Amino acid sequence: MKETENRGRVPRLRFPEFRESGEWETIPLSQLAKRSTQKNNRGELNSVLTNSAEFGVVDQRDYFDKDIATQGNLEGYFVIEKGDYVYNPRISKMAPVGPISKNNIATGVMSPLYTVFRFNNSHNDFFAYYFKTTGWHQYMRQTSSTGARHDRVAVTNGDFMAMPLPVTLLEEQQKIADCLSSLDNLITLEAQKLGALKTHKKGLMQQLFPA
C-alpha cells in the first residue's frame, strides 16, 4: 500500500491495484441496506442476542450469565439472521454513540430498542470494519439527541438509514476486508500463544520452588 496525497474521498493508504480507480463515493445506508423489522410473532425463536460495545453480537446468556429477557416477552423482539447488522443506541466509553456490529453467530432475536438492518450485497465485511472506526460518529451526533435516560442515543429510523457511508469498488472493499480479517486472525493466534506461555510459566513457578 502507498500513502496518497489526496485526502478527500481517497484514503491515505491504498492497495497498488486501486490507485488509479478514482475517488470513493458517499452513499446513504438506505441505498445499500434495508431495515429488518420482522417480529418473533409466534415466539418460535428463543435465542436472545445482544450487541455489546466490546464483544459485538453475542448470546445474551453468555454475556450476562443469565437470561435477561423472558419467554413471555420475546414475541415483540426483532428477528436477526446471521449476516445482519444491529445498532445498539446504548452509550458507553467504548461506543460513545452506540455500537454497530455484524451478527456472525446465528439467527436469534433482538430487543426492539435496537435497529436491525441487512445489506443488499452479502459481501459486506468492509462495512463491519468501517463501523468499528469513528468515521460515522459525527453524523450520529449531528442528527440525534440523547434519550431521556441520558445513556442512549435517540435517532429516527429515517435519519439512521440516511447515514452517509464511504463506498468504493467491490473488489477494493473485499481487499480491505480480507486484509483486516487476516490481521484479526493473527491477533487471535498470538493471543492464544500468549495464553499458553502464561500457563507454562505458572506451571514452572509451581515446580521451581519448594512447596
Where are these regions (language model features)?
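A short beta-sheet element
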Residues: E75-W136, R149
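Non-catalytic DNA-recognition/assembly elements of restriction-modification systems
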Residues: V10-N40
